[in-house]
A protein has these predicted regions:
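Carbohydrate-active catalytic/glycan-binding domains of CAZyme proteins
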Residues: 1-124
Length: 124
């Protein structure tokens, strides 16, 4: 579900690459609080792409998809799946994230694998 922020509803979605239908990327958009059918901003560039080894080695190589997100203090944390085999997380400063999205800049998320199919845990 979208996250309520002071600037609007923050929504994450996944989409296929135009160049390669086997690759899934994650995008973000900000919707109006009172009228969520109105898109205020949409990230020009994907916010997550399958560029880590654990996002390209598994049941569905080249696939990342957000399964949840939460705002903790001034950080936004996205929980996502990598290659349908790994539980992953990515995070960024919320203010910087929103600023980058509004300015059509590339959004830099710090990411890492949390747990893989063998239940090995790795801190991000």
């Amino acid at each position: 579900p979208p996250l309520k922020t002071k600037e609007g509803w923050l929504l994450f979605y996944h989409a296929m690459s135009k160049d390669d239908f086997s690759k899934y990327k994650v995008g973000a958009m900000l919707l109006d609080l009172k009228d969520p059918s109105k898109v205020l901003y949409r990230a020009k560039h994907p916010i997550l792409i399958p560029d880590e080894c654990y996002e390209n080695d598994g049941y569905k190589p080249g696939v990342v998809y957000v399964s949840g997100a939460v705002i903790i203090g001034d950080e936004i944390v996205l929980h996502y799946g990598g290659a349908d085999s790994y539980v992953c997380a990515a995070h960024a400063n919320l203010e910087e994230f929103m600023k980058s999205m509004k300015q059509d800049s590339i959004i830099n998320l710090k990411k890492g694998k949390i747990k893989n199919k063998n239940n090995d845990i790795k801190k991000i």
